[in-house]
Amino acid sequence: MDIEEWEQRHAEAFYNAKEALPYLDGMFVAYNSNIDAIRHLTEEDLSKLVGFFDESDIQDRVAAYPREIAEPLDFVARLLISMREGKAAEVPAYTADIHEWLKEHLGFDYARMGGQAGIISNLLGRLGLKKVVAYVPWLSEEQAEYFTATGNILHPKVENGKVLLKPPGEAFKPGIGSKVNWILEYSKDMNVTCAGNTFKVPRDNRLIISSRPKWLRLDMDKQIYEQLDTLLPVDGAMLSGYQMIKEEYEDGSTYKDYVENSVKVIEKLKSLNPELRIHVELTSIQNRLIRKAILTEIVARHVHSLGLDTVEVANALNVLGHEELSYSVIRKGENGIMSLYQGAVQLMKDLDLERVHVHSLGFYICILAKGHPLTLKEHRDSLLFSSVLAAAQALNGNIENLAEAEAGLEVPVSSIGLEDLENFQLYCTGRKLCTPDEFEYGYVYGSEHDAILIPSKVVERPKATVGIGDTISAGAFVAMLAKIKQKHSGK
């Protein structure tokens, strides 16, 4: 694989997608947005945090692997686990106690739009789409201020029994509280010492403490559901936030009620526009029962596309009964990319999907069901476009418009990602999934699926890591939909 060739392909793909985007009528994005309080940690910050506790207590809590943040010691333990492995993690907190403790003992550098649906809505708005309909069940006045003022982002609001699309600043629910998540970012090569043990952080990443207040419900307003046609025309929907569903609620309802309602929304969207494609963006889901329910009851058979990272592939495989493959994905090693590929194929089969898009540091894998309306090159272009967007976001911290996104073209293609793909070539050619020439283009042909593998652009020292995965998935999905619309128009 020639790195210069891939640089050229990125440029060509970016301009092809730019040309296709105006063909889209609009996108629907739901459900989760919040305010992110972001702190970039230094070694001094870490020493201070560790210093608040007895180090043997920290070690015990690390070994216990807390799955929620019930007290500050849980937070420090999960932070050390995340830093040791260099892996992103999202851990829920069900009270405001940790929020108050962090404000008092650490503080944040700045606040911005958070939550997958919020981040994706703002990105699509800035890419200049005609219309982006965002829907957040808990839209507060403060939260509404974090939507970008591009004029093309709208939110449904019920007025006198009628659903109208209005700018978020005119569509919020009065008197509702805001959901605030803490994002603790850390850098590669930071030295960490606790209880006599020292390690070096292997890569830039972050720990997210996800606020899950008791009043939070992942649901759609009944009147908005009944008048869902007011959202149209839209060409696609990107849905996320299902990780917020709880097993049981104080009012006696359970996760089953919210799963059922979520599926009803998906099915109604599809009935209103049979051409509509729906993408679910996965994230870290600590609760295994909820993780399995999301995959087998919401995603399987109901949506077209799934976006996720390496850890999420492993976690999904695990609850679907593929423990050995899951372990192989998470362990990485020399066969890591082969396991990741096999895992993505398995997810497509198990969940009956049209498309599975996996983003890993340095490369992306996209598995496609046979009979998809685009050529492999057109699919590849959509992935390369998203690679440029992600590079621009990592480089500058955000993307204000398509012109600014071009900065991503200056970021080099990852040589490590390219090397990972070259190691995978023997696996593909050995199984006759492609010829060496086809692999040079990133194309793989299975008996029941096709696949595209591309090396991505990677910023050595990113300004921010939050939202990069959402940018990759959203950029690729809308570029794909735009190309389908452009082809249908015959232009």
From Swiss-Prot:
Subcellular location: Cytoplasm
EC identifiers of the protein: 2.7.1.146
An example molecular function term from Gene Ontology annotations: phosphofructokinase activity
Positions that bind Mg(2+): E281, E312, D470
Cellular component annotations (GO), alphabetically ordered: cytoplasm
Domain of life per record: Archaea
Record text on cofactor binding: Binds 1 Mg(2+) ion per subunit.
Catalytic activity of the protein: beta-D-fructose 6-phosphate + ADP = beta-D-fructose 1,6-bisphosphate + AMP + H(+)
Keywords, in A-Z order: Cytoplasm, Glycolysis, Kinase, Magnesium, Metal-binding, Transferase
Domain ADPK as annotated: residue spans: 4-486
Family: Belongs to the carbohydrate kinase PfkC family.
Full protein name: ADP-specific phosphofructokinase
Organism: Methanosarcina acetivorans (strain ATCC 35395 / DSM 2834 / JCM 12185 / C2A)
